């Protein structure tokens, strides 16, 4: 069984070779306000800075480290039932919150039977947060399904928010190890499909130079080493 990473970090992983950047390396800066596609894999940056009304999606295949990233920068834990408010008033939405809430009523059913309900509740919470709050909304999503990217982008535009993505790019073996470490494993076939769609998405962004969805203001591609060196994600007026 793989060893667990130190709490709050994503240690010990080399930058992914799955989708090598074709752009010139980003200059080493302490603060970046993303406004386009930024490939920061293997880079060094202290702070990402977004508008206070941003919709920020933290994306990656299962086990990539999305929940750990949310905990590291926003103090969000996935073992609570309701969304947490992080620094700068950000509301943080993780699908595991819906799973914990529903488990009390549906514990007697095998999880695959009520997984669609979890995703429905999660997306209802995303819609409500984008509609009803004025501060930043941070969203946990794999981004490997086009319909989820389109839906979130549509809602963000509908409620006057800029959509930004942080994409955690890690090798499949590392993501699989992350699933074992957290104790939540994805079916092997489903995981393989996630990886295939992720690779296509990375090609779209890095080689075809297209955004993952129309209307996305920025895309930041990072690996675990980059995340570990970052100190904060800020939202400013």
Question: Which ranges hold each PLM region?
Answer:
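Conserved GTP-binding G-domain of TRAFAC-class P-loop NTPases and closely related GTPase folds
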Residues: 55-59, 64, 76-81, 87, ...
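Glycine-rich phosphate-binding loop used to anchor ATP phosphates in small-molecule kinases
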Residues: 113-163
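Phosphate-binding P-loop
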Residues: 45-53, 129-132
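Conserved phosphate-donor/acceptor-positioning beta-strand/loop module used by diverse small-molecule
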Residues: 159-178
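Conserved nucleotide-binding/hydrolysis micro-motifs of P-loop NTPases
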Residues: 97-99, 143-144, 169-174, 226-227
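Conserved substrate/cofactor phosphate-moiety recognition/catalytic segment
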Residues: 68, 73-133, 174-176
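Residue-level preference for the first positions of well-ordered beta-strands
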Residues: 53-57, 135-138
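NTP-dependent small-molecule kinase module
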Residues: 1-30, 42-46, 204-237
């Amino acid at each position: 069984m793989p060893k667990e990473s130190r709490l709050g970090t994503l240690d010990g992983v080399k930058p992914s070779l799955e989708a090598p950047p074709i752009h010139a390396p980003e200059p080493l800066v302490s603060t970046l306000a993303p406004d386009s596609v930024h490939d920061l894999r293997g880079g060094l940056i202290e702070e990402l800075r977004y508008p206070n009304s941003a919709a920020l999606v933290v994306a990656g295949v299962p086990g990539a480290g999305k929940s750990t990233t949310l905990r590291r920068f926003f103090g969000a834990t996935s073992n609570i039932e309701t969304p947490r408010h992080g620094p700068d008033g950000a509301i943080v939405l993780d699908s595991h919150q819906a799973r914990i809430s529903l488990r009390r009523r549906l514990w007697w059913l095998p999880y695959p039977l009520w997984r669609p309900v979890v995703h429905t509740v999660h997306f209802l919470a995303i819609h409500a947060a984008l509609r009803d709050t004025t501060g930043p909304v941070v969203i946990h999503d794999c981004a490997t399904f086009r319909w989820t990217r389109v839906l979130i982008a549509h809602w963000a535009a509908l409620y006057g928010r800029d959509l930004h993505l942080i994409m955690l790019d890690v090798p499949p073996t590392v993501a699989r190890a992350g699933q074992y470490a957290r104790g939540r494993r994805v079916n092997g076939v489903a995981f393989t499909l996630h990886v295939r769609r992720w690779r296509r998405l990375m090609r779209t962004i890095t080689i075809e130079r297209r955004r993952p969805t129309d209307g996305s203001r920025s895309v930041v591609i990072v690996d675990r080493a980059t995340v570990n060196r970052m100190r904060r994600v800020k939202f400013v007026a």
